[in-house]
Amino acid sequence: MRRIQNLMEQWLFIGPDNRQEQVNLPHTWNAKDGQDGGNDYYRGTCHYEKTFEKPEFDPEAEEVYLEFLGVNASSDVTVNGKELAHHDGGYSTFRINITEVLEDRNKLEVTVDNSVNGKVYPQKADFTFYGGIYRDVRFLIVSKEHFDLDYLGSNGIKITPEVKENEANVHIETFTNTEEAQVNVQIKDQDGKVVAEGNGCDVNLNIQNPIRWHGRKNPYLYTAVATLTVNGEVKDEITNRFGIRTFSVDPKKGFFLNGEHYPLHGVSRHQDFKALGNAISTKNHDEDMDMICELGANTIRLAHYQHNQYFYDLCDERGMVVWAEIPYISEHMPGGRENTISQMRELIVQNYNHPSIVVWGVSNEITISTKDKKDMLDNHHVLNDLCHKMDPTRLTTLACYAMCGPFNRSAHITDLVGWNLYLGWYVPGFFLNDLFLRFFHLVFPNRPIGYSEYGAEGMPNLHSRRPRRGDHTEEYQAKYHEYMIKCFERHPFMWSTYVWNMFDFAADARNQGGEPGMNHKGLVTFDRKTKKDSFFLYKAYWSEEPFVHLCGSRRSDRSEDTTTIKVYTNQPVVSLYNNGELIEQKSGNHIFTFQLPMEKENKIEAVAGSVKDAMVLHHTEKENPDYKLKKEAKKSENWV
C-alpha cells in the first residue's frame, strides 16, 4: 500500500553569488525583494540540495516517486548525479520515478529558474513571480502495480457525474500501470456508507436520490474509493472526493446551479503573504478561506495560475464556485504556445474531479500587447478546443483587458467572457460601468458577460472626508465599491463578478500609495490583520451572519463640527449612540448614514439588534496630516 514521506526540512539553498544557507520548505528567494518595490527582485537561477537516506521500501515489490507540488518556474531535478527531469511551469504538480537511481545515501539537486525568457508563462504581469520550491516535496512509495502516477501529475482517477432528476450516473475511469490489475470502485456518502459499487477500470455507478453539491448552501461531497488488486492481493488504493451537481449560464439571467438561480458574487485571490511570499502553509490557506467565507462570497477566481490542491479542496468543502486558469497573461509570446498547452493540460488533469470548478480560464488581459495578434488568436482557439476536448462538462472563459473593446475577436472565442474594468479608478466616471454593460448586452444579448476584475486601491492609514479618485484612501475605496455593488444589482444578466482583490498582494514594479512593491486593491491587508471598510460593505450585502460595522474608525481625528457616520450592516434597523446618548435610530438596507455634531471626545456605538460596534473620535482643530498621501508618493496609475 502507498505511503507518503515528506522532504521538507534541512535543504541547502545556494542563491545568487553562491550565497548558501540551510532552509526548510516551503521556500522562496523573493520573500523580501519581491515585495519592497523597485522592480528589481532577483530573477535567475538558484539551487537546492538535500542529502537523504534511502527510504524504507521493498525494491522487489515497490517503487519510489519524488513528487513536487510547486516549483517556480522551470526546474531540473538530479539524483546522485543523474539528470531525471525538466519541468516548465511553476504552479502544477510533477513526479519522477527515482527507484532505479537510489543508493543507500543520496543527493537530490534541484535547479530552479525564474529568469526572464520567451517560452514559460508568466513573464509580464502585475504580480511578483516568486522563485523557489514553494510547495511540498515528498516521496510516494507504491507497489510496482499501482494507479498511474506518470500522466501530467494525475492521481489516476477521473470522475464524471451526470445527474438527471432523482438519480446520478457516475462514470469513474481509473488508470493503472499494469494489465493484470483488478479494480474495485466504491462510492461512499459523508457517513461512510457505501451507496454504489462496481468492478473494472471503466465503470458507471448509479446513485438514487443523490444529495447535490449546492455551493455555500450545501457543499455535499461523496468519496470514491478505488482498490487495485493482483491475484487477490491488494496492491494500491486511492480515494477522491467529488460532488454531484449541474450548472448552466443564461446570457439574460446569469448563473444557475442545479437548476436554481445562483448569482455568482465573489473575489479573486493571489497566493502570497507578507514576508512569506508564495511559500505559505496550510494555516495560511485556512485563514484566507475563513475570511472569504466570512465575507459571504460564493465564488473565487483563483488568479492567475494553478493554486495549491489544498485550496481547491477547501473550495470543494466550503462550497465555493471556482474559476481556474493558467498564467497565459498580458503578452502573447510566439515561443510560449507549447507552454500554454502543457499548463492547461496539467490544470485540467490535476483538477478535473473538483466539483467547485465550473470554468477553465484560458488567458488574462492578453491584448495588453498588440504584437503577434494572429498567432495569439490562433493560440486561443487551440486552448479553447483543448479544454472542450479534455473536459466537455465545463465551460471556458477569459478575462479581457480594459482597453479590449466589445468587438475584439479575442472576446468571442470562449463560451463566456469576463472584463477587467476599473472605471472610476484608473479613469473617471463610475457611470461608465453601467454604460459599458448596457452597450455590450444590447449588441451581444446572447453573449454571457461578467466582471473578472474590478477594484480600487485603499490604504487603511489614508483618509479623507471628501475622498477623490486616486487618493488611495480607505474612504474612496468604499465609495467605489458602494457604486459597483449597486451597479451589478442593476444588471442581473451578469454571470459573475469578482472583486480585485480579496487581499493586498505583492507587485514589485509598483510604487503607489506610499508603500512600494504592493497592489493595495485588497479588501484585507497583505498581512491579513486589517479588514478595510470595504470588506464590511460586501459582508453587509452577502453574509447572513448578523453584524454591524462603524466605518471610518481609523479616521479618529476629525476637524469638522458635524461629521458623517457611516454604518454597514445586514440588519434592518440601526441605533447610533454618542457618549451613551441615543442620537438617532434608522431603518434601511446595508448602508446607513448619520449626521453627528462633534464633541471633544466621542464614544460612538452602533447597535443593530443583538450586535454592536464601537469607536472613539476626537474633534480636532485641523485634519491629521498623516491621513493624506505625501506629495512624493505616487498616486494611482495602471501598471501597464
What feature does the model see in each segment?
Residues 171-173, 289-292, 299-541, 545-564, ...:
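Substrate-binding/catalytic cleft of secreted carbohydrate-active enzymes
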Residues 1-304, 314, 318-322, 343-346, ...:
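Secreted/periplasmic carbohydrate-active enzymes, especially glycoside hydrolases
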